[in-house]
Design a protein with these regions (language model features):
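Small-residue (G/A/S/T)-rich helix-start motifs and N-terminal tracts that mark the onset
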Residues: 6, 11-174, 178, 182-199, ...
Length: 332
């Protein structure tokens, strides 16, 4: 597919992607000075920009040098989500990961992650965390550099109370993923009241529910939907899908073109949320962590597809390729 002068954002997201093969931009001789004065609605995330976000890791570093993140979620029958989120956070380079999950799945989660600290939270009879689930070791959220809540959590009323409590208490960057978004009522006004930076990572269906719209409306203009979600919540919004868009107040929205249809499987969103919280834990700002996270996840997914095929790859295969992407981006 040939486009003239500059990429067009309609070719990079939603149904436009289906009409594009290998995209080639043809130079028409437009002056760079002229292009500098063009106001583009969307920027493309590129490898050089992402790599520049990561500094040298000091030789005298210790595990605390690279941050400590807390991940809350999991439930009976859905413990794999929090395992993948935690593993992705660790592979992103964060120094420490603590996990809280219901007591009934604690042993399975702990056995799946030798490098994470796993705490058992009190649970309801349906196997989800209770509002007063807090284990002694994680009650002080200020002890962490970032928090992720939602993977595999469930959508029962108790889960909503858990999410509300965390939003009210959290003072460090907070990622709301999956069920931490699904428990909100239409156009919930709690998120804008948060005293911490909030990152939301919805797929189109989750954003449609949150915004009280239909999925077709979200997908018809993903950029506008993202902007409206930012305006409604004051959060950084990561609208997942083909041509993932990241938007935040005061920032120009960006679109990501790494990734492939093989990533359209259960668990891929948990991997992305884990990468983003891991990058937040290492000190990246919310918008930077979000745009770097979607690029890294997509590029790792592309590597996994080359190894295994799009049809045969799984979400956990994306995690296996994160270290190689980090080495390519950072040179070490």
């Amino acid at each position: 597919t040939v486009t003239m002068g500059l990429p067009k954002h309609g070719l990079l997201t939603a149904s436009g992607i289906e009409c594009v093969g290998s995209l080639k931009v043809v130079d028409l001789g437009i002056s760079p000075a002229f292009l500098e004065h063009i106001e583009c609605p969307l920027e493309l995330i590129v490898a050089e920009e992402v790599g520049a976000l990561f500094g040298r890791r000091p030789r005298n570093a210790h595990k605390g040098s690279f941050g400590h993140v807390l991940i809350i979620g999991g439930s009976a029958g859905r413990s794999g989500a929090i395992v993948m989120a935690a593993q992705a956070a660790l592979r992103s380079g964060v120094g420490l990961v603590s996990v809280v999950t219901p007591r009934s799945v604690w042993s399975n989660v702990a056995a799946s992650m030798k490098e994470a600290m796993v705490f058992a939270g009190e649970e309801t009879t349906s196997g989800v965390l209770t509002p007063d689930f807090w284990p002694a070791g994680v009650k002080d959220l200020k002890a962490f550099d970032a928090v992720l809540v939602g993977p595999g959590m469930g959508t029962q009323d108790e889960c909503r109370l858990v999410v509300m409590d965390i939003i009210r208490r959290c003072k460090v960057p907070l990622v709301l993923d999956a069920d931490a978004l699904n428990v909100h009522k239409r156009r919930d006004r709690l998120i804008p009241t948060a005293t911490c930076a909030v990152i939301m990572t919805p797929h189109p269906g989750e954003l449609a529910r949150f915004m009280a719209e239909d999925v077709a409306g979200i997908q018809s203009d993903r950029l506008d939907a993202c902007r409206r979600a930012v305006e409604a919540t004051k959060a950084t919004v990561v609208l997942k899908g083909a041509g993932t868009i990241v938007a935040a107040s005061g920032e120009k929205p960006v679109v990501n073109m790494t990734g492939n249809p093989g990533m359209a499987k259960g668990g891929s969103g948990d991997v992305l949320a884990g990468i983003i919280v891991g990058l937040l834990g290492q000190g990246l700002a919310p918008f930077a962590a979000s745009r770097a996270g979607v690029y890294i996840q997509g590029r790792a997914g592309d590597r996994a597809a080359l190894r295994l095929s799009q049809a045969g790859m799984l979400a956990r295969d994306i995690i296996d390729d994160i270290p190689f992407v980090m080495r390519e981006l950072c040179g070490r």
